[in-house]
Amino acid sequence: MESAIAEGGASRFSASSGGGGSRGAPQHYPKTAGNSEFLGKTPGQNAQKWIPARSTRRDDNSAANNSANEKERHDAIFRKVRGILNKLTPEKFDKLCLELLNVGVESKLILKGVILLIVDKALEEPKYSSLYAQLCLRLAEDAPNFDGPAAEGQPGQKQSTTFRRLLISKLQDEFENRTRNVDVYDKRENPLLPEEEEQRAIAKIKMLGNIKFIGELGKLDLIHESILHKCIKTLLEKKKRVQLQDMGEDLECLCQIMRTVGPRLDHERAKSLMDQYFARMCSLMLSKELPARIRFLLQDTVELREHHWVPRKAFLDNGPKTINQIRQDAVKDLGVFIPAPMAQGMRSDFFLEGPFMPPRMKMDRDPLGGLADMFGQMPGSGIGTGPGVIQDRFSPTMGRHRSNQLFNGHGGHIMPPTQSQFGEMGGKFMKSQGLSQLYHNQSQGLLSQLQGQSKDMPPRFSKKGQLNADEISLRPAQSFLMNKNQVPKLQPQITMIPPSAQPPRTQTPPLGQTPQLGLKTNPPLIQEKPAKTSKKPPPSKEELLKLTETVVTEYLNSGNANEAVNGVKEMRAPKHFLPEMLSKVIILSLDRSDEDKEKASSLISLLKQEGIGTSDNFMQAFLNVLDQCPKLEVDIPLVKSYLAQFAARAIISELVSISELAQPLESGTHFPLFLLCLQQLAKLQDREWLTELFQQSKVNMQKMLPEIDQNKDRMLEILEGKGLSFLFPLLKLEKELLKQIKLDPSPQTIYKWIKDNISPKLHVDKGFVNILMTSFLQYISSEVNPPSDETDSSSAPSKEQLEQEKQLLLSFKPVMQKFLHDHVDLQVSALYALQVHCYNSNFPKGMLLRFFVHFYDMEIIEEEAFLAWKEDITQEFPGKGKALFQVNQWLTWLETAEEEESEEEAD
């Protein structure tokens, strides 16, 4: 199959199709995974029977021949498909669709090959994406389905078929690897060769073509709307450790998919999403870090939505057209009539090949290649002059003074004939025919007509549409340049001027008017080109690292920070080299004194303040040095402690945050570097400052430990070993409070211990209340049901146990009321502590209800807190469903009792 796809020749019918394959050259397709399994040998029905050796050899030869024949048949099918795709045009669409369905798509392998060919063709030719999308719609409906009948989906949604599934899989693969081929060339340090520039241009066209093809398929409901939203979110999302200026390719793809399928997605249900997308695009549009071209693309896309998705005329007719439509557009926009090809006997090339025609006037047909065959003849051989059209042959009956306008064959510029060009005999002939009148006052008024603003132009081009008369080109603009160095001499500016802004053709004098001869025309102004300034190539990576080493060494010796910053500025380093330069700054100071390390940290902070480096640059540099730790530890054993100092100073100077530092160090990566960094922060600042900063960061400390140590007991042990247990005072309280209650359960002693050991700030913390209530409940349970007693949770406790439980709870009542009184939210936390305690004890019979009644009767918890606990919905504490089931009847009684009391008070 791969060979047939790679060869990609036209089918044997292509000779009679008439030049249909001129839109794209054959491409080599990559091998696809999963095809070889369809080409292997398959055992026959008698695989289990004993077969003589001679017969086996014959069967092996037969199987090999069958496999070869099968491969040849597949090759023939794929060649025929390639030929059909090469001939696909709007006129032949229905006919070629039937041919494609009848090529012999009888297996999933062949269908997959057809999809690969169609997708690759659509990626090569983005202008024809809508045509290939229509082809996919037809194949999705009519191609064989090898997956079997599927369950009925939602109404209005396309049924999933083999074709649709394989197509989406291929497009997903192209989308996920969209920038891979372009990045290969963008990451080169040296300038690209012309061949590499061409390959990069092809890769970029295929990347944008894939996005446009996805959008066209989305228009036809072949791709679900949710998939389109996922694509847009992926393109808008800023990746980790990716600079904003490196998002250009994704943002260009984003603009392409918005232009293609934006109107379909912008409906009432998705309005909030679209508003978020465009708010993000507006913010990116104002970012100076992005290239100007990307910012203008974003601006055009935002303006497109503001104008209710009505594109400018330049984008209206950007799809495939029939030949008749192209001819009609030429008449309407250019004033050029391009007749259909005639018989050779009906043509008269009097002006093009006559004896009086100057050599410069003979247009060369070769540069246009197959375009000339499609148009029938060259543009300019028949020129429109108002409502009538001057034909490409001379006839005396067409008017006494009418004649063809003469155009320069290279750029379509009006060229006044002179005596020296035509010769004496030619000059007399031209005068006798009145052709000199065509150039009277030719240069006047031409530039003023070009200066008018066109409605079809973007606002930023409204003041740039001024051209000289010798800059106008009538050649059809190329869709792209394969090589940036191959720039047309007279074409670049005219491609930005829409047809409505181009100057009108010069009118010939009316019939009967005497031509005025001998008038001089103003010569065109010659603009002097500014002298080319030779640009100094950017320094290489090795040069930058050497310069960085020199600057940093001088800075560490002299301490002049401003001189070091200016030295880095003068390097004019590309931004993608900054992380390695910062890594060099860190490494150079690692084996020096603490003062030098502090100087290096200050230099990095200054570079950020000057706008040279960013937080992402520092994190990339920091991680680069961490990756080199095994080598560095040979010469610098305490390298992780020194790196922790750099990280701590970066956090203090707000170069990075604790959460940004923690993210790449999760699951014990480079353990114990994160804890060493916290130690340095506590040393450089103070404990209270670090505790507040750490709590604001919302970092999960358990996740920062190796997986084997990710539990509370082990975490507390490690933190105590590093002197960081002050970060989690409640974790330490949970372990020590129960121990203190067992030593002396009197309320006075417990309250005094809490007051002496727990910060007053934590007395109103929900976590503290949870631990306090849990400790009391655990102590009561251990006293009522000692661990030595084997009690069944399903059996009811004795009267003595119930009385003991009540008396113990009464003894702790003063402490509970001290911390819970008038705090409904803390009372709800106390109820959740009771719920979790019962859950961990497997909900002993009647325990939850008994404690609810005790809390209510002893006025420890108010009615409002009980009802708030009932209505609260949270997944943080387990066992809520079973707990509600056990106390629901009592809570209902509580609600009715409260209502009766309120009614009595009202009476």
From Swiss-Prot:
Q: What is one Pfam family matched by this protein?
A: W2
Q: Which Gene Ontology terms describe the biological processes this protein takes part in?
A: regulation of translational initiation
Instruction: Describe the location of the W2 domain by residue ranges.
Output: 720-904
Could you name the Gene Ontology cellular component terms for this entry? eukaryotic translation initiation factor 4F complex
Any keyword Protein biosynthesis?
yes
This protein's record includes keyword Phosphoprotein: yes
Bias-annotated ranges (Polar residues)? 503-516
- Omega-N-methylarginine is found on R360, R505
Where, per the database record, does this protein carry N-acetylmethionine?
M1
Question: Region Disordered: what ranges?
Answer: 1-71, 498-541
Q: Where is this cross-link: Glycyl lysine isopeptide (Lys-Gly) (interchain with G-Cter in SUMO2)?
A: K575
Q: What does the PTM comment state?
A: Phosphorylation; hyperphosphorylated during mitosis.
Q: What range(s) does the MIF4G domain occupy? A: 78-308
- At what positions is Phosphothreonine found? T89, T508, T514
Positions of modified residues (Phosphoserine): S11, S395, S443, S902
- Report the Gene3D superfamilies cross-referenced here: 1.25.40.180
Task: Provide the MI domain boundaries.
Answer: 543-666
* Quaternary organization: Interacts with the serine/threonine protein kinases MKNK1 and MKNK2. Binds EIF4A and EIF3. Interacts with MIF4GD. Interacts with DAZAP2.
Quote the record's miscellaneous comment. Answer: This gene has been shown to be extensively edited in the liver of APOBEC1 transgenic animals. Its aberrant editing could contribute to the potent oncogenesis induced by overexpression of APOBEC1. The aberrant edited sequence, called NAT1, is likely to be a fundamental translational repressor.
Query: What task does this protein carry out?
Result: Appears to play a role in the switch from cap-dependent to IRES-mediated translation during mitosis, apoptosis and viral infection. Cleaved by some caspases and viral proteases.
What is stated as this protein's family in its record? Belongs to the eukaryotic initiation factor 4G family.
- What protein name does the entry list? Eukaryotic translation initiation factor 4 gamma 2
Task: Give the source lineage, highest ranks first.
Answer: Eukaryota, Metazoa, Chordata, Craniata, Vertebrata
